[in-house]
Every structure is written in C-alpha cells, then in structure tokens.
C-alpha cells in the first residue's frame, strides 16, 4: 500500500490577507523538500480578527482570492494536492461571510468546497461571549473526497464536536 505523505503548515495568522499570503507562500516552499502528496493549511489562512467591520472590509470573494490563485499554481508546479483549512470569504448578495475549506488537486483544480456548519456561539461568562453566527453563514453539506483511495472528510474547528 502506498503511503500518503502529508505536510501540515502552521503559522500565526495576521490581520491582513497580504501578510498571510506571504506567510503561506514561504511555508509552501518549505514543504518542497518533503515531497508531500498533500499540504494542509490552518483555519482562517487568509485573515483573523474579531472585528466584524474589518473582516467585511478586508475579505475578498472566492474568485478574487490571491491565496486560492497562489495555491492552485503551487499545486500544478509541484504536483501536490492542497487542503486550505479555511478562508474567510464574502459571498455575493450576502451580509455574512463564509468560513470555507478548499481541496485543490495536484492539477490545480478546486475539487471540493466545505463551509463550516457549526458556529461557535457561547457564553463563557458575563464579560465574554462569542457569536460566530453574527458574522458567518453556516454551511449545510457534509463533504468528503477521495485521495489515493483514502476517504478524507472535511471539518473546521468547532465542527469536530458534532
């Protein structure tokens, strides 16, 4: 049985998409020496902040996202599949963003998209609450793909609890 070689990229996301795109590109290049079959990136690979207005102003639509364009090109040039853990993206005619994961084939094609289903809405105490549902639209579909005869399911952060 063939082994599946996976490189997991970890980095502390910044609040600007340009900074994160540069961090991802640097980390993609670092994986080359391992010759992975699959590269995985973290949740919120493009931007992270709790400021909803900043998010709405500084996120892009999927078709305009520089990280997707870069990942597709890298996948082709290096014959590697890429799972973008998630990107925070705008959607046409919607006031909320989506938290979307992508699977890009080694041919540079998006073969799967998954929108986070379970929003993290919680009251920690009187002073601390989190309401992802105020900013993000929940996904509806469970998604999986096959890579080298291995079934891979998608989940983003809080989805793991369900």
Describe each PLM feature range.
Residues 10-15:
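Short polar catalytic/cofactor-binding loops
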Residues 1, 41-45, 135-139:
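Short hydrophobic/aromatic-rich motifs at helix boundaries and adjacent loops
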Residues 92-162:
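Active-site catalytic loop in hydrolytic enzyme cores
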């Amino acid at each position: 049985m063939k082994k599946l070689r996976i490189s997991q990229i970890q980095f502390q996301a910044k609040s600007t998409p340009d900074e994160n795109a540069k961090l991802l590109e640097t980390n993609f290049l670092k994986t080359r020496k391992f010759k992975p079959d699959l590269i995985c990136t973290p949740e919120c690979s493009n931007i992270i902040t709790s400021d909803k207005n900043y998010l709405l102003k500084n996120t892009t639509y999927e078709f305009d996202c520089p990280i997707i364009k870069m990942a597709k090109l890298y996948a082709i040039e290096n014959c590697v599949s890429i799972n973008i853990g998630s990107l925070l993206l705008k959607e046409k005619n919607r006031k909320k963003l989506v938290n979307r994961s992508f699977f890009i084939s080694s041919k540079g094609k998006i073969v799967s998209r998954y929108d986070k289903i379970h929003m993290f809405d919680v009251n920690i105490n009187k002073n601390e609450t989190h309401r992802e549902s105020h900013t993000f639209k929940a996904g509806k579909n469970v998604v999986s793909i096959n890579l080298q005869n291995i079934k891979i399911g998608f989940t983003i952060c809080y989805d793991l609890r369900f």
